[in-house]
Amino acid sequence: MKKLFIVLLVALVGFASTSCDDFLNVNENKDAPDKVDAYLYLAGLESAWQGLYYDLRATAPLSQMMGTGSYTSYAANFYSKGSDAAGETWRIAYWLHGMNLENMVNQAKADEAWTLAGIGLAIKAYTWDIMCKLQVELPMKQAFEVGRLSHDYDYQDEIYPQIRAWAEEAIELLSKEDNFAYGTKLKENDRVFQGDADQWIKFAHGVIVNNLASLTNKKNFVSEYANQLLQHGKLALASANDNALMSTVGGAADAQFSIYNNFWGVYRGNLSNSYWQSDYIVQIMTGTVPVYDETTGDKVRTSKSDSRATYYPYELNPKQIIADTLVELAGHFDPRVAAKLSTSDDITYEDIDDADSVKMRRYYGSSFTGASGPIGTAPNVFGRFAVSNKAYDGTGRWIFRDDAPYVLMTSAQIKFCMAEAYFKMGDKANALATWKDAIKDDMDFTVSQLLPGKAKDGADYGALPGGDKISKALFNQLAAEYLAGPFVGQITESELTLSHIMMQKYVALWPWGANEAWTDLRKYHYDIKYSGDYPTLDNGWTLTTVDQKWDTDESKVYKGFYLAPAQVQNRRGTYNVENYGSPCYRIRPRYNSEYMWNLNSLGALKPIAGDALNYQCSIPWFAYPDGYPM
């Protein structure tokens, strides 16, 4: 009996192991694998980056790049309660990338596919840098620990160095010779640089530059960070040819999937008629920043009666930074306004190659939450006062096309960061030269995305729809004049100010770089007037009003910029009472992740707890001149 039992047991074990082997073979099914080659992760990881544009719906209004009738709570420096709005970057980092990205990097390292591993780490550093500037404190050390039901938060001063470390490791791996044969697989799955390791190295250096650039207002920036920024800047994107652009397929309704079209294009209709160019971007790009009476805060009505006065009925600040209204003089007109901003003028595209006509167009900006602005009504990004429609707008224009690439990083952006660093170090010569190069690079980027419209020749409006209202030839002509003119080429070392650098950077980032623009505004505390190291209640704002620097204050960085409850005309609103008078300094963590499942960890944060009513007003570490005031 004992022998029979042993025989049966051996037989059962043999049967069990055979069955198990057969079962496990299912996991090697080519149609339903549980493990894929590392390179197959890449296209999906990059594609997730389109979600960064989703969160621009919040940060573009927060940075006053756009007004919105949709994300109005963010336009009002608040947040959407009980909602995942503005939480897509969080979702990308922790879920869409998450373990997929970790697996790709680890598998690539095991395969000695160093280029792919380096790309993965560059992707991680870039995404986390953006997320850390938006949500500030994050679960990092425990983020991907298996089995955890809650995750402790790490502070920004710990996360920032780790982001740079990931980028440094990416550079190291990308510089190694692969011991893996990709064939065409890497090129075909990389929508940004088509597997070009040298370009990814520049990109990773750029991530470090952007990370360090948010620290320029810290007391130790020059001694601790400036030289690092410049070192990496010299190795980052060098020209518009290096720009990090993620391709899209386009195709409108003919595309296999809707998301193959750009999020901002005509077909997907996400900008439609609910997002508009702000009055601030229109003012600085058209040279119409007004004069405010510092006693009353009101704009000063002009006594002039010419045609320009009927367009802009207020006295203008005599010291415009970007451009002015003297368009008949060479170099006073910035042609980027004709590409980046929209106008309802010239709907037949007859004059896109006529300099005088292009210069005389009128541009209108929105209020914070509506198309109607202080001097007129802003059109949508396609130049009309209605929802986007292929019959009228075609495939779109500029970077608002169905097939437009997603803009991740530009050489202009990097050079503005370097110019700011040089300026902070007192090296005005290099600051000036780098600043001029940055503006030229943004001109090159801007014209590269133009899709000039075609004249209608008397046909119905919709016969040849869409496109940009300036030709490439005219843009280049006017760009050359502008670069040689009084706002760029004729600026001297002694005349260069921080306003020149940061406001030109703001224009270059419009609107794809709203996340970085909002970071810059926060690190300079929105040009709020305060004493000491940082603003607080009754030292920069009251419960009802923000006290901002006047444009005549030489220390004011963003001339013409005023928050909603400021002391000037068209800005006399109020914030939600839960802000206690403060502007917004951060995006709250994704609701369905943290407020539903990780609230205890969130509530432990200091100096303002993550479950506090005014957590969105907690100042980030990068904006404190020293450390956190714990």
Predicted regions and their residues:
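Hydrophobic helical h-region of N-terminal Sec-dependent signal peptides
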Residues: 6-14
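Structured, solvent-exposed acidic/aromatic patches
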Residues: 69-450, 491-496, 504, 628-630
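Membrane-proximal, proline-rich intrinsically disordered regions
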Residues: 20-73, 327, 337, 348-353, ...
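C-terminal structural cap/anchor segments
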Residues: 428-533
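C-terminal/domain-terminus segments
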Residues: 230, 234-235, 242-244, 356-357, ...
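Positively charged n-region of N-terminal signal peptides that target proteins for export
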Residues: 1-4
